[in-house]
């Protein structure tokens, strides 16, 4: 049975119980004990949770907090795009160079703009999220790392009845859908790891 260490934000925490149940025949899923909000937190988590455990697969579910505006009316982000790309590269290289684990990057899902209270309150927008995701995917491709495109999965399944109360986290049905889609890809990755 393969061992998977997964790090991610609250969105990841929401779908992980279902994901663990779906993978129970193929893999043991261990979720980091606290949500990992930014790429900086992922950097710390690699040393704290991935390297000591040496799982067959290390999954990094990117959170959208990196893309949050830090000042209302300005466009500066909590983690600037160039720093985000560097962090992703460092995270993936640490796993590739200091372990036998297969790293996997999961992109940030889009926000549901119908339910985000106000752009200035949350400071999230899908254009920026998409830009950060493309940067992470380019880094992963350069390093030969698998990507699970949660942004694309959610966009492709967009439905008018899909409700996220504050526009960021998913309801139970949305989390189940995400878990199912991610499980399919993780089974493929585990089979090769």
Feature-to-residue mapping (PLM):
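A short, Lys/Arg-enriched amphipathic alpha-helix followed by its capping loop at the start of a domain
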Residues: 15-27
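Alpha-helical cap/lid subdomain in secreted, periplasmic
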Residues: 22-25, 41-193
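A short beta-strand-loop structural module common to alpha/beta enzyme folds
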Residues: 26-42
